[in-house]
């Protein structure tokens, strides 16, 4: 058995959805669990509906949702030629869930309403794709993942209840695979014990695919993207990127830790634990080799892997009485960062000072600054960049740092980090 995950970009247009169907058809004789995200731009549209609803602009929220529902109906008609009664009823049934929410007087936290509304995106897209596959003769079963993925009620970042999810996944999926080779479900969403919808947070669709791969002991996972492979840098920021054909789970986690927009570490863990290889391939050209991510002991020669984080703040915290920055002071400072939910990207301490590079987040930063200034003198530089290079060479540093001023630098055998302006 394999697991495929398709992101929203892969089905954003009717043309792409048809191409994805052709790709899936190549695997119709194999057992494949297919995890599909919301159609491209749908989640952003749903977030606007949540914002309008929570701001008490109920009429605006209802109008925006009516437009989104009409968009999906049109998409389905264009894809299928004409919607079947079964699909029309399914879409109406799903949309009614959100309409009920939008008719309520809200008295719960924003995150609760976010999950009830945003979760509809994956359900609509998968319903349409499953109907289309069956219409063109590719038999596929549609499953509501909320009947399987059980979580706590941490809305927008729910924690999976592994034992319940494992039991349900094995029961439901194994029953489906006895009748079908292809099973379609959703990523990113789940439900609590009382069947309240939740979302799984950042990279939730990839994570869903990895969780089910772990539970079902599949042979591989493939994430289909609109890029040819993993690259050594963001092509929007670095013009001369090169593909990475093979990489270890450990190296991907290192890349993600330093801020690379690759596979999230929480997606890697369930796969690494079961030694399940992960492929990143291009849905625009299925014949491209892509990238293999796996456990291996062989030496891999990597190109310099570069990450540039923008909008950084360099914060210097000094003791007022010239006392040393010892474990006691460090503990106090770390506690304040944790309380303000601020992640430190790079740190360095000297005798009487502590320096940290952090993402700019005005609301949280102001809270942190106020707390620090009660006991310490604080200086800051803003609008900076954090430049990280794994497997660096002097040539690449000379090329990329031309006309840059380095404010802080740390270097190990394989990694160099610099705060620059």
Regions picked out by a protein language model, each given a short descriptive name:
Residues 1-263, 268:
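Nucleotide/pyrophosphate-binding catalytic subdomain
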Residues 8-9, 39-40, 189-190, 205, ...:
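Short, glycine-/Ser/Thr-/acidic-enriched flexible segments
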Residues 175-192, 255-280, 315-330, 381-400:
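Electropositive, surface-exposed helix/loop patches at the edges of structured domains
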Residues 246-294, 300-302, 312:
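A conserved active-site cap/scaffold subdomain adjacent to cofactor or substrate pockets
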Residues 1-2, 31-34, 73, 140-141, ...:
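Structural motif
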Residues 289-421:
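A conserved regulatory-domain signal marking ACT and ACT-like small-molecule sensing domains
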Residues 136, 274, 340:
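Conserved dinucleotide-binding and phosphotransfer motif residues
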């Amino acid at each position: 058995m394999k697991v495929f995950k398709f992101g929203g970009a892969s089905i954003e247009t009717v043309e792409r959805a048809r191409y994805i169907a052709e790709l899936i058809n190549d695997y119709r004789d194999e057992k494949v669990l297919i995890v599909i995200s919301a159609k491209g731009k749908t989640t952003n549209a749903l977030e606007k509906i949540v914002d309008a609803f929570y701001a008490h602009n109920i009429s605006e929220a209802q109008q925006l949702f009516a437009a989104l529902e009409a968009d999906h109906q049109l998409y389905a008609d264009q894809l299928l030629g004409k919607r079947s009664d079964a699909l029309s009823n399914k879409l109406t049934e799903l949309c009614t869930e959100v309409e009920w929410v939008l008719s309520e007087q809200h008295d719960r936290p924003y995150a609760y309403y976010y999950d009830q509304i945003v979760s509809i995106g994956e359900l609509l897209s998968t319903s349409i794709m499953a109907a289309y596959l069956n219409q063109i003769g590719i038999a596929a079963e549609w499953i509501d993942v909320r009947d399987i993925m059980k979580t706590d009620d941490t809305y927008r970042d729910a924690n999976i209840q592994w034992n319940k999810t494992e039991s349900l996944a094995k029961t439901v999926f194994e029953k489906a695979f006895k009748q079908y080779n292809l099973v379609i479900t959703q990523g990113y969403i789940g439900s609590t014990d009382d069947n309240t919808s939740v979302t799984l947070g950042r990279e939730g669709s990839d994570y869903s695919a990895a969780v089910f791969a772990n539970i079902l002991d599949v042979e591989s996972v493939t994430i289909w993207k609109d890029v040819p492979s993993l690259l050594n840098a963001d092509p929007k920021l670095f013009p001369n990127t090169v593909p990475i054909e093979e990489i270890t789970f450990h190296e991907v986690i290192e890349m993600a830790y330093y801020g690379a927009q690759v596979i999230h570490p929480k997606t890697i863990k369930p796969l690494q634990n079961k030694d399940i290889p992960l492929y990143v391939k291009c849905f625009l050209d299925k014949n491209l080799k892509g990238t293999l991510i796996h456990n291996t002991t062989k030496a891999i020669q990597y190109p310099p892997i570069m990450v540039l984080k923008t909008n950084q703040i360099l914060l210097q915290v000094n003791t007022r009485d010239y006392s040393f920055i010892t474990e006691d002071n460090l503990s106090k400072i770390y506690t304040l960062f944790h309380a303000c939910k601020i992640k430190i990207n790079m740190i360095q301490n000297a005798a009487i000072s502590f320096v940290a590079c952090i993402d700019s987040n005005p609301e949280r930063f102001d809270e942190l600054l106020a707390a620090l200034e009660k006991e310490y003198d604080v200086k800051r530089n803003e609008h900076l960049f954090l430049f990280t290079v794994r497997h660096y060479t002097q040539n690449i540093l000379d090329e990329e740092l031309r006309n840059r001023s380095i404010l802080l630098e740390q270097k190990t055998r394989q990694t160099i980090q610099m705060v620059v302006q």
